[in-house]
Amino acid sequence: MVWRFLPDLQAIVAGAAAGFFLQRWFLPRYRPLLYPVLGFIGLGALLNIRLLFGAVPAQWEIGVRGLAFALAAAFVAAFPVGLLVRYRLKQNPDPLRRKILQAAVAAPIATMGFGIIAARFHPLLVERDLVIPGLPADLHGLKLAQISDIHLSPFLSRRELARAVDMVTETRPDIAFVTGDLITGSRDPLDDCIAELARLKASSGVYGCHGNHEMYINAEQYASDLAAMHGIQFLRNQRATLRFGQANLNLAGVDYQPKGKPMLRGVAGMVVPNEFNLLMSHTPEVFSTAQGQGWDLVLSGHTHGGQLNLELFGEQLNLVRLFTPYTYGYFVEGRSRLWVTRGLGTVGIPARIGAPPEVDLLRLVKG
């Protein structure tokens, strides 16, 4: 199973190499500081491939691993800038120019620091009207709240989750949705996460679906049972009917749908003709299949909005776009709609840049 860790190890090695050359080119006097930095990155690699599993307390393990990845990523981002600066300095070694260009090399590292320290702590309340042709009149104005990708861990505390739960509850939604990834790994406080989510209030109930991180630790059933004790119903390839006036809302949820396998198998039969059909799926990759099956609205998360995102000329640039076109926002295909939230937490690198955390309030509007 070593192959599972190869991408992470490649990232760590690339980060260490980039840090080595950046120090050699621009900070030769600070070479003694380089070795502890590279050692810290190496420790993160050992923790990631579980060579020290159990020897380090869970919070320390997750913290060191996350910060090591953040440092490696910052060095990788700064490296191409460093190459360009080095080339320019060879052409014109003016001392003032050198200082300005060296500051440019530090910019990606400083940005990563901001993403770790500040940008991931302040969730936004994103409000959006979803205009849906043919929406039953009794569903017009229905308020749907969504919270997703919590990843409760040393990098997102219970107190921060409580703040997000309060934001959702204050909107007084008709239905609240929890769309997966409550935690990241087996050593994260799943029970605490569900206990905090139990404070969610919605007039017609709180519903959820599971994400890939519950699947990774085989915790879907445990989390579902515990959540049910707190009044939260996780739908695992199941449906429920919610009545609003003379209209039915047919709500369904699915467990995580792995890429490369058939999507939404056995789910088409849960679509109810002449009702508004809403599907919860952690991954937005199901959308094309859902559209073919007749789902009116899909609520998803999973992508974190790219997590490390750069907006350039109106385009969102991030690694997630290499894997899915559904990175963030509202999408329409035929009569079907998809909403993808940026969610709350982080995974891998404990930073958010250009993709602030959020909770969502969506209003159904008759088109």
Language-model region placement:
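Non-catalytic terminal accessory segments
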Residues: M1-F121
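N-terminal signal-anchor transmembrane helix
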Residues: R88-A107, F114-Q146, S153-D166, E170
